[in-house]
From Swiss-Prot:
One of its GO terms (cellular component) is cytosol. It comes from Porphyromonas gingivalis (strain ATCC BAA-308 / W83). The gene is rsmG. S-adenosyl-L-methionine binds at residues 85, 90, 136-137, 149. This is Ribosomal RNA small subunit methyltransferase G. Specifically methylates the N7 position of a guanine in 16S rRNA. NCBIfam families: rsmG_gidB.
Length: 221
């Protein structure tokens, strides 16, 4: 078994849980995930982007949860992804570490949250990440996929996202579309898309109890 190096005391423990489910990370990726703890602890004390009582659960509730999108699809190199309503950088920043050859645009309508996401991405050396303070209606680009984390109801999200999806150059295992992280009972929310949407339960693939109600929803657009 590979020995996991001791983490600096200034960083919250928890990167072991990332390596548990993603054991083939490069040394650079491991370093970036480790650095996230200290960076978010610092920035969250200045600008509240994560509940302060939840910052100790950063790796389980935020980083690993974000990486649940990779359980639905492994993005191919050259894919372009929009993280809509990124907040402080979730799910976009963990995904950008996992997929260094994929380009990510992280967008939020709240400027102080974008400031945190931008600072963290820069500190991590994520050259594949851009950030933008704007609303979805102001985005003038198209993307292969849009990801989000419980931003709004699926029907509202789909309506906003349709015009932002690139129709040509389909290169991934799933057609271009929307992938979002959801929790709780989704039957009513997914009903209008029952013939198109795919739902993936994160538990027991992620065996921690936190994930028992967590799902990934994919909708081709």
């Amino acid at each position: 078994m590979q020995e996991i190096p001791e983490k600096p005391l200034s960083q919250p423990a928890g990167t072991e849980i990332i390596e548990k489910y993603f054991p083939h990370l490069s040394e650079r990726q491991r370093e970036q995930f480790e650095q996230m703890g200290g960076l978010y602890t610092h920035w969250n004390a200045l600008i509240n982007v994560i509940s302060r009582k939840d910052i100790d659960n950063l790796y389980l509730h935020h980083v690993l949860h974000s990486l649940g999108i990779a359980r639905m699809l492994n993005f191919k190199p050259g894919t372009s992804v929009l993280d809509l309503g990124t907040g402080g950088g979730f799910p976009g920043i963990p995904l950008a570490i996992l997929f260094p050859q994929v380009s990510f645009l992280l967008v939020d309508s709240i400027g102080k949250k974008v400031k945190v996401a931008s600072a963290v991405a820069e500190a991590l050396g994520l050259d594949n990440v851009r950030t933008m303070h704007c609303r979805a209606e102001s985005i003038g680009e198209k993307f292969d996929f849009i990801v989000s984390r419980a931003v709004m109801k699926l029907s509202e999200l789909a309506k906003i996202c349709r015009k932002l999806i690139r129709r040509e150059d389909q290169q991934n295992a799933l057609p271009n579309g929307l992938i979002c992280l959801k929790g709780g009972e989704l039957q009513h929310e997914i009903l209008p898309f029952r013939n198109k949407a795919m739902t993936e339960e994160l538990w027991p693939t992620f065996e921690e109890e936190y994930f028992k109600t967590k799902k990934v929803v994919y909708l081709p657009l």
